Amino acid sequence: MTAFSGESLARNKYTFFAAKARADGFEQIANLFLETADDERAHAEIWFNYLGAAGKTEDNLTSAAAGEHYEWAEMYDAFAKAAREEGFDDIAVKFELVGKIESEHEKRFNKLLKNVKDNEVFRSGTAAMWVCGNCGHIHIGEAAPENCPVCGKPRAYFAIKAENY
């Protein structure tokens, strides 16, 4: 777990370093940070797989929801209280705001878990616009097609079209 955590931390750190290098006008350095970050992701995946940490999607959604619940209900709440006690009110507010985001993440994962359990991931119950994530084909119906009639990708590539613009 330590190797996985270390590689994961390094990946994020190098990604942030890349953004700073790019902002400072160092494209080559930014690209090398990103290349190294991707290497670190690959290393993290090796250790993650050895840990057997990725189960079935239902199990992963349950784990993700539990992790998000812990973050908003315990971790960020405790961090906010400690920051406030130490006089860092601005940081306490950030912890509370991030906690609210984590609560929304938990809701999202629980909704997705319910959809998987109820076999509703690719069904809407009413006519909907399903978009192929590979080629953009639009299918109108209560369920996504088994395969895209344009590019042949399986149902897994379809999602209900989000028109939030």
Model regions: which residues?
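Non-heme di-metal
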Residues: M1-Y165
